[in-house]
């Protein structure tokens, strides 16, 4: 992959802030948008290792707000970076009457306005066929890990780091790493990138398995309903093994009450689990 790295890289210094302009905005659903930001030139790539994410920084109400996002575009894309983001509006969630600071800021951005990007950030690096590097913390050196089957538990916009990996692995004919995903959402309308996930599952049936669970399923729903359970994990994800790695990303309740306790109950050890 690196032999063709002639393109200029945007994220040269992980501590620097790079102002990037909003060049396109697409409404994906009632509360989800795709934001496209322009890179310094049409030839630039972002320069983000697979497994890593970026931070967006903005001054909102005199306060510096920093949020982490995994782009859905990759370094095969030149001149732009795409983010899929769920907007947390005011007065929707009783616990968060103010809504999301950063997401509402993005929602109100006009084409041509800029926001600061910083990165790469992250503890997981995917180096190619089943080879991963995992940092125990942000500053340590990555520890080599080999996996032939990646299990994935994602909730809501926690799908973006999974999509980054799924796309990268299925695009590489030499990579036979298997992936199984449980994707949890509130309603059927909330399922992000559904079309793409189902297309990948259809074209790579031996490599990618897809399963959904919904809090409020429609009548006749053929997948699971409710929280991610131990039975669901047992049925749809690879069993505990040295060559199994389970990736988890989503809201805190999914991680703390559904994913981690059930994985531990089923005998997955700490080194078999990575939480974004």
UniProtKB/Swiss-Prot annotation:
Residues 15-127 form the FAD-binding FR-type domain. Belongs to the flavoprotein pyridine nucleotide cytochrome reductase family. This is NADH-cytochrome b5 reductase 2. It comes from Homo sapiens. Keywords: Acetylation, FAD, Flavoprotein, Lipid biosynthesis, Lipid metabolism, NAD, Oxidoreductase, Phosphoprotein, Steroid biosynthesis, Steroid metabolism, Sterol biosynthesis, Sterol metabolism. Signal peptide: none annotated. The modification N6-acetyllysine is found at residue 17. GO terms for molecular function: cytochrome-b5 reductase activity, acting on NAD(P)H; FAD binding. One of its GO terms (biological process) is bicarbonate transport. Transmembrane segments: none annotated. The modification Phosphotyrosine is found at residue 18. FAD binds at residues 107-137, 146-181. PANTHER family: NADH-CYTOCHROME B5 REDUCTASE, NADH-CYTOCHROME B5 REDUCTASE 2. Restricted expression. Its EC number is 1.6.2.2. It comes from the Eukaryota.
